[in-house]
Amino acid sequence: MAKSKFERNKPHVNIGTIGHVDHGKTSLTAAITKYFGEFKAYDQIDAAPEEKARGITISTAHVEYETPARHYAHVDCPGHADYVKNMITGAAQMDGAILVCSAADGPMPQTREHILLARQVGVPAIVVFLNKVDQVDDAELLELVELEVRELLSSYDFPGDDIPIIKGSALAALEDSDKKIGEDAIRELMAAVDAYIPTPERPIDQPFLMPIEDVFSISGRGTVVTGRVERGIVKVGEEVEIVGIRPTSKTTVTGVEMFRKLLDQGQAGDNIGALVRGVTRDGVERGQILCKPGSVKPHKKFMAEAYILTKEEGGRHTPFFTNYRPQFYFRTTDVTGIVSLPEGTEMVMPGDNVTVEVELIVPIAMEEKLRFAIREGGRTVGAGIVASIVE
């Protein structure tokens, strides 16, 4: 049977459920599919397949559903470690998150950790589902839990006072036992997600950026740089900058080709060769980027949120300490960097996630939210994301 065509007539948004173990993330995911998609039972979602992202194995379940306003792709992870890995590697991009918190327990350690991770990896918006409200008889207690969640969100720089909090029971929705806290709450939740989580800007509408993968010299024509356009559009005749590794320089794109055909422009997702004016074959190298002038700056020092692989995942067998010097693989190239651990952290064990400061030996074109792999001699030992730029 032919797959049904993916209708592109609605904006597409990627979201996911986050929160403490056993607070009902997977049950809620199942309940949403019941009313807005093709129903997936708890067991189907819980048996999440393994996938690889940046050399790291992660279990993630993907479901899709739609509201009258939008089409959603939704991720749910079976284990806490999968959440950490998922959010840091960006295996499943999140434009927003549904924080699930049990009304019976209130915020727990992983509730806090997932909110911190969401802040560090730049999840733009969170909506809260206060689950299991049927287990709380006292209305004042319910209010107290809501207040606690709002304060926790505010403490991590999310707008805790404005974030929608919907109270309900995923189980009631799945069992059709109480319409008010079941179906009605799920519908109210999705209305809040529609309204509160902003539609992401499409890559094509962002400023042009192409990581350089290769450089060729074509006799009689000049220098061609190749790569996959990450975002935006480049038109023949436009001025671009070459950023990273060496001092930033300007050039003009005098030709764009794809599959040996000449084009008048290249856009996000295209694998292109760009002919650049006045650049010698050795004036540009893999690991630099072509970009819209002034849109990206080179940096050496940044704060990163990183996950360090366990021995079982093919990572290090031993901890590392301050002054650890691995390679950081950004886009197309490895750059050596020096790691400084935060005060009070003696060492980092395989399997940890940690905030560290990194100083690269050469500057790389970077912005917040840029992801990287941590490698030792070509072997991946961790993954990370630029949380903030220091200099």
Swiss-Prot record:
Pfam families: GTP_EFTU, GTP_EFTU_D2, GTP_EFTU_D3. Its main location: cytoplasm. Residues 55-59 are annotated as: G2. It catalyses: GTP + H2O = GDP + phosphate + H(+). Residues 131-134 are annotated as: G4. The keyword Magnesium applies. GTP binds at residues 19-26, 76-80, 131-134. Mg(2+) binds at T26. One of its GO terms (molecular function) is translation elongation factor activity. InterPro entries: EF-Tu_GTP-bd, EF-Tu_GTPase, EFTu-like_2, EFTU_2, G_TR_CS, P-loop_NTPase, Small_GTP-bd, T_Tr_GTP-bd_dom. Residues 19-26 are annotated as: G1. Residues 76-79 are annotated as: G3. Monomer. NCBIfam families: EF-Tu, PRK00049.1, PRK12735.1, PRK12736.1, small_GTP. This is Elongation factor Tu. The gene is tufA.
